[in-house]
């Protein structure tokens, strides 16, 4: 229930799960303490904020050695446009999830940012035409 509505009141949550408000509060606190709940955040409309284009970018590094990978990971951390970065197994090294205003903005981002990231040898871009499913809820 908290995944679907992180702002649900303790009283409403207690009613939904048929427990006392005190028991629910204790359980939620325990979930925080034990690291099951990492935090709460607002879901924003990217289009309204000038970030309507979602792209996924495959990154192939010139060398997969620790110093190159560490430099790449550090550089990715400071770019707000890069929402996610995953080291993957397969035909490339990293998969990035990037949000920008539009294709013109992405072209600029690709030329000025992506190619200046440490160790980047090759990129492949996949522009999202339609978000069919977008959730952060885990299947529990």
Name these PLM-found stretches.
Residues 1-140:
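A compositional/biophysical signature of low hydrophobicity enriched in polar/charged and small residues
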């Amino acid at each position: 229930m908290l995944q679907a509505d992180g702002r649900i009141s303790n009283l409403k949550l207690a009613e939904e799960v048929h427990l006392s408000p005190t028991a629910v509060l204790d359980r939620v606190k325990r979930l925080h303490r034990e690291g099951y709940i990492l935090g709460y955040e607002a879901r924003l409309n990217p289009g309204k904020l000038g970030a309507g284009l979602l792209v996924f970018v495959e990154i192939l590094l010139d060398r997969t050695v620790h110093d190159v990978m560490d430099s790449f990971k550090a550089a990715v951390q400071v770019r707000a446009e890069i929402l996610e970065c995953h080291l993957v197994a397969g035909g490339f090294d990293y998969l990035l999830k990037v949000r920008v205003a539009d294709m013109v903005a992405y072209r600029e981002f690709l030329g000025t940012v992506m190619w200046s990231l440490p160790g980047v040898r090759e990129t492949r871009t996949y522009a999202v035409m339609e978000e069919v499913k977008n959730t952060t809820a885990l299947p529990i």
